[in-house]
Amino acid sequence: MSKLIYGLAGPTASGKTSLSILLAKKINAEIISVDSSLVYKGMDIGTAKPTLQEQDGIKHHLIDIIEPTGNFSVADFISSVNKLKKEIWARGREVLLVGGTMLYFKGLIEGLSALPESQAEIREALEYQKKAKGLQYLHQQLNEIDPQSAQKINPNDQQRIFRALEVIMISGKKYSELVKTSKVGGLDEDLKLCALVPNDRSILHKNIESRFRQMLDQGFLDEVQNLHKNPMLTKETTAIRSVGYRQAWEYLDGDISYDEFVKKGIVATRQLAKRQLTWIRNWQSSINIVAMENETKELDILKYFGYK
């Protein structure tokens, strides 16, 4: 009989962290973080990274594993999960996936498109073109070759622009066509996924604003200031494009006022939550939806997982 993998998804500020600790204790699990921002070292406050005290003795994985200058793709995530699950099971524990990066969950559920691997020389050529003519030029080039892909990719998203152009240069085919081909990877096991959603969206919005202001009190700007000193980082770096960090960077660059930074940071976080909830709605026929306000949510999730 195939092993089961358990999952808890939800929008930012929905209470995933504290609930996941309770669940992990009940089912004897280790937690694998499903969060594209928690992988970065030195980005603790703005990502609401669980402290050792908050982890409460539960082993966590895929937290603080790379520098902010690096990238951690969906493929990297899937590969890591497939390696970690075996190690966790060998220790006699269950696997509990927890987070809000829905592209990571999507990769586990659906697998990845069979795209060619990255080639260093092509990346270097694209980097040279970007320095010479700018990222907007590369996005324009993509639009001329593959308008369908260009339309879906933000003109400031260097990682995805580079990847789309790289795939086109290697394969000679449109990126938008290749991503529709057969999928590879993902999980071999069944994923029992629960998702927290708010009955009242205004409660989630209040949680988001409250947590953002709490982060400021905890020294979030000092954290970003420390990152800002690194000449290898810009506001277009994948890590710095994380919600809150991008807006703080603009403030430190002098592009916006402090009040604008706070307002934009809160709005951007609410927009992130809206996108996360859209993903969850699209999956609602195959996952278990639990109201974040529900006082019996822990018991309801345990029952869905098959525990009493």
From Swiss-Prot:
The family database entries (InterPro entries) matched by this protein are listed as: Dimethylallyltransferase, IPT, P-loop_NTPase
Q: Which segments does the entry list as coiled coil?
A: none
Q: What is its EC number?
A: 2.5.1.75
Q: Where does ATP bind?
A: 10-17
* Record keywords, A-Z: ATP-binding, Magnesium, Nucleotide-binding, Transferase, tRNA processing
Catalysed transformations (reactions): adenosine(37) in tRNA + dimethylallyl diphosphate = N(6)-dimethylallyladenosine(37) in tRNA + diphosphate
**Can you tell me which family this protein belongs to?**
Belongs to the IPP transferase family.
What is known about its subunit structure? Monomer.
Q: What is this protein called?
A: tRNA dimethylallyltransferase
Q: Which organism is it from?
A: Francisella tularensis subsp. holarctica (strain LVS)
Q: Which gene encodes it?
A: miaA
